[in-house]
Regions:
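Non-catalytic terminal/linker segments enriched in charged/polar, low-complexity residues
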Residues: 1-123, 130-136, 158
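P-loop/Walker A NTP-binding module and the surrounding RecA-like catalytic core of P-loop NTPases
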Residues: 81, 111-333
Length: 333
């Protein structure tokens, strides 16, 4: 049963709900959670491993203990702002005698971090009945953008959607080739032009083809590096505008792909792209290879942007819908 491309309002409404990336219940469970905990082991060690050692044998919450806690949170890549807010919350609870036992610090932080991660969906436009959901995927080179698009296409395909991949990163021939390989692997339609072509023209032609072929989901790969930051943002802005002219409301969603291993740089990238394009969703890749997974907390808290997917490995099924409760449980329990 298809999710997108519905011909009546009620079906289109349910399509929007289903587009949030939730997978069938049978695909969730103990096996995935165990793998999630394994892949987040470095992040867990960075945060709760050091926290456990800090509070071991402590009888009270002192100023020195809070200073050490602040260092643990900051060096776990939660960011200056998020770390300070967490410390302020703990200090307030201590001052009010609501928190006395160092052993309760962990549960306090767990509860507050879960609150930070629970970000409501950003405003997003809904495709009209019979029109495809158009997703523009952005991010700097090297974050795993093209691979993420291929894996996301597989998720959409698994739910019966007709998917089209669009090679609008025309500045790198390798990106076009890589996306074409992914399209064949997952069974998606593919639109490209020659290297160096106008990315906006590629997107315009792709949306025309998507309408005629009754495509349900269009995923657009974009450039990640031009001569200057301004050139890149101008180019992406043009792609955005052309998509909207061809299909009013498009792109309906704009996903930003970030590399978790870059730590605090990911927050500055998110701010830059969000100011220029209005990001609806964050996708965080390479969480399995880093102790900097705390960056998820900083991004959600500072930018109030929801995390849509996380990448925890190289396999096609390792791009998973983000679940804040599972993430916090994997780190703290």
């Amino acid at each position: 049963m298809k999710i997108f491309g519905s011909k009546n309002k009620s079906e289109a409404e349910s399509a929007t709900l289903d587009s949030q990336g939730q997978e069938p219940e049978q695909e969730k469970g103990k096996g995935f959670f165990k793998r999630l905990k394994e892949r987040l082991a470095k992040t867990k060690s960075s945060i709760t491993g050091r926290l456990d050692r800090l509070i071991l044998g402590k009888k009270e919450i002192t100023g020195d203990l809070l200073d050490e806690l602040e260092e643990i949170l900051f060096t776990s890549d939660l960011g200056v702002e998020t770390t300070q807010v967490l410390i302020d919350i703990v200090q307030d609870k201590v001052a009010r005698k609501a928190l006395k036992d160092p052993a309760k610090l962990k549960s306090t932080l767990k509860e507050q971090i879960l609150d930070f991660l629970t970000v409501p969906p950003a405003d997003r436009r809904t495709p009209a009945p019979g029109e495809p959901l158009v997703v523009m995927v952005v991010g700097v080179n090297g974050v795993g953008k093209t691979t993420t698009i291929g894996k996301a296409a597989a998720l959409f395909k698994s739910k019966g959607n007709r998917v089209m991949l669009v090679a609008a990163d025309t500045f790198r021939a390798a990106a076009i080739e890589q996306l074409e390989i992914w399209s064949k692997r997952v069974g998606a339609e593919f639109i490209k032009q020659k290297p160096g072509a106008d990315p906006s023209a590629v997107v315009y032609d792709a949306l025309e083809a998507a309408l005629s072929r009754e495509i349900d989901v269009v995923l657009i790969d974009t450039a990640g590096r031009l001569h200057t930051k301004k050139n890149l943002m101008d180019e992406l802005g043009k792609v955005n505008r052309v998509a909207g002219k061809k299909l009013p409301g498009a792109p309906h969603e704009t996903w930003l792909v970030l590399d978790a291993t870059t730590g605090q740089n990911a927050i500055s990238q998110a701010q830059m792209f969000n100011e220029a394009l209005g990001i609806t969703d964050i996708i965080l890749t390479k969480l399995d290879g880093t102790a900097k997974g705390g960056i998820v907390v900083g991004i959600c808290h500072q930018l109030k942007l929801p995390v849509r997917y996380i990448g925890i490995g190289e396999k096609i099924e390792d791009l998973r819908p983000f679940d804040a409760e599972e993430f916090v449980q994997a780190i703290f329990d």
